[in-house]
Amino acid sequence: MRRWMGLFLGCATLAHGEITRHGGGDEALPDRQYVHVVSQAESPVMQTWIKAKDGVYIAAAVRKPLSSKWGNGPFPSLIMFHGAPGGRGMDQLVGWSRGDHGGPVWERFLQEGYVVVVADYRGGDWNQMNRPSSTGLVTAIDDGITVIDYVQNLPYVKRSDVSVYGVSLGGNLAMYLASRVPTLHAVVAGAPAPIWFLGVKLNPDGSRPDLAKAELDPAVVRENIAPIRMPVLILVGTEDRLMPLDIMLHDELAKQGKAVRLEIFEHGYHDFVLGNQGQERKDLPRGEILLPGALEALELTLKFVREPK
């Protein structure tokens, strides 16, 4: 705790960064009142296959906001990238898009007039797939760029108002997309695992190092952060082992003068921002629950994506 507080107090003074810590309870809220709130008859899930750079197809679940309330567009859009592993498949994406498991995020943006795209990306070898390749290998980063290009060119989407929200490993992807797609409106990294984005080396056996003592690669950090133009929002919980790394991510963005905010939520477990995703989590005694902090983070995220700053 002492080490973390030192990091917190130190980075809170950075000129271009902003860190806020949120309190709140750890009770499990009933989640069913927050899901299935948008008519699937009026806003059906469109199962979409997007051709990737190498000819394979990327699954995406797309929903448009209600025309009875929002008209026919063009609409702003939020593209959401899930956590590990890549290659979840269409059924999983559709379930998330509908809020079938209790997570409120996807439908909340739909309620506010956003085209919500829940997109997949390829899995595979961690080190090969989760950073750009210099050998021509098509990676998850290429898939993310392809999805953004597809969404930006949809006739009912406002091209200049497309944002990305990535969680966990999807947060690593989101940061690479912030670096490589300057036309994005805003980028949100929820409980991100920016291991490759920051040049952190895995252990020789492929396992994750102690992230509280992680050593970043300064050259990789500079190269990846320098091109970023849009504001970035980072969300993490105090019970998440990735918190030290996410503080480092905030610090590095702030050092390079980027517009970045870090919001830290008491009691937040890894991926708490999405609530129940329908996953078996042996690391969580109560399983995936909807925390008060998740709802606070959701409304904060919605406000940020509307007006990034």
Residue ranges and their predicted role:
Residues K69-F75, G83-W126, L242:
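Short substrate-entry loop that stabilizes the transition state in hydrolases
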Residues R241-I247:
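Conserved alpha/beta-hydrolase "acid-adjacent" motif
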Residues R21-G73:
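N-terminal cap/lid segment of alpha/beta-hydrolase-fold proteins
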